[in-house]
């Protein structure tokens, strides 16, 4: 597995996912870099389906940011660039970051194909302010990405780094899969939001309180897997509050009102509201 502090581009040379002899025992935060091998990254947009996802989300994130007067945005989990591109097209000043070099490269190429030049950087959230300078109006962490942090110490450290990178009145937007419903009632999905590709399936292969192992199956019969931590909604809200964030508002599938077990995904919007100006 490539080390976070070692070769920054090691995963670009990886051809296959490798979970060793006991995949369910692989529960380390640093594993995400080895999971997103280039062959998986190249297929990621089939899973998302940019057009369908844009239709399902509508103007949600654009409206949230505009309503609060936010302009300078840090996308800390840019993936293949979907949200960075949508926000750039809407006129926001976007910096796009990801811990995985293959994702950063793909995001840049996707933007270039749309006549946009992304400001990209490879950055691990746990050392975010080492790799990215300046303060931002908003940080977005989307695509169920926060779930890649397997240790609580890493979650707290990442939230502290997000807090430090925001301006005094900045906001943080984090989304997550509805793991509460999966843990308590089993898996079901409307397949309407986030992973909108209708030829691709994404479903849990194994779930316990400390691991959600998802399998992604593509039309060419290729399969990939991700080991993630099943974040409960109120647990993440508690971590955000303890990191200093206030007025945390949670949406279910982009709606303000919802039944707890119904949404496929939650979106948390929180404010820094530090009394001291920069």
Predicted regions and their residues:
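Class I SAM-dependent methyltransferase "Motif I" SAM/SAH-binding loop
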Residues: 77-81
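Conserved class I S-adenosyl-L-methionine
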Residues: 2, 6-7, 11-71
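Class I SAM-dependent methyltransferase SAM/SAH-binding core
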Residues: 82-128
């Amino acid at each position: 597995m490539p080390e976070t502090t070692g070769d920054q581009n090691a995963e670009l040379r990886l051809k296959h996912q490798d979970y060793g002899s006991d995949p369910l025992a692989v529960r380390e935060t640093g594993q995400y870099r080895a999971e997103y091998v280039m062959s998986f990254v190249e297929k990621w947009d089939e899973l998302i389906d940019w057009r369908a996802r844009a239709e399902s989300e509508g103007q949600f994130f654009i409206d949230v940011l505009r309503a609060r007067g936010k302009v300078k945005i840090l996308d800390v989990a840019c993936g293949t660039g979907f949200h960075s591109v949508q926000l750039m097209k809407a006129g926001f000043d976007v910096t796009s970051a990801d811990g995985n070099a293959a994702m950063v490269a793909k995001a840049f190429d996707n933007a270039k194909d749309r006549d946009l030049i992304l400001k990209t950087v490879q950055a691990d959230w746990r050392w975010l302010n080492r790799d990215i300078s300046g303060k931002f109006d908003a940080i977005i962490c989307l695509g169920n990405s926060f779930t890649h942090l397997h240790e609580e110490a890493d979650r707290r450290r990442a939230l502290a780094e997000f807090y430090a990178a925001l301006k005094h009145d900045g906001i943080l937007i984090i989304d997550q899969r509805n793991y509460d419903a999966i843990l308590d009632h089993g898996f079901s999905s409307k397949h309407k939001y986030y992973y909108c590709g209708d030829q691709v399936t994404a479903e849990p292969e194994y779930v316990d309180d400390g691991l959600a192992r998802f399998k992604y199956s593509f039309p060419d019969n290729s399969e990939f897997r991700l080991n993630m931590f099943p974040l409960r909604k109120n647990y993440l809200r508690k971590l955000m509050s303890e990191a200093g964030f206030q007025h945390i508002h949670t949406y279910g599938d982009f709606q303000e009102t919802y039944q707890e077990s119904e949404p496929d995904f939650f979106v948390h919007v929180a404010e820094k509201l530090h009394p001291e100006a920069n």
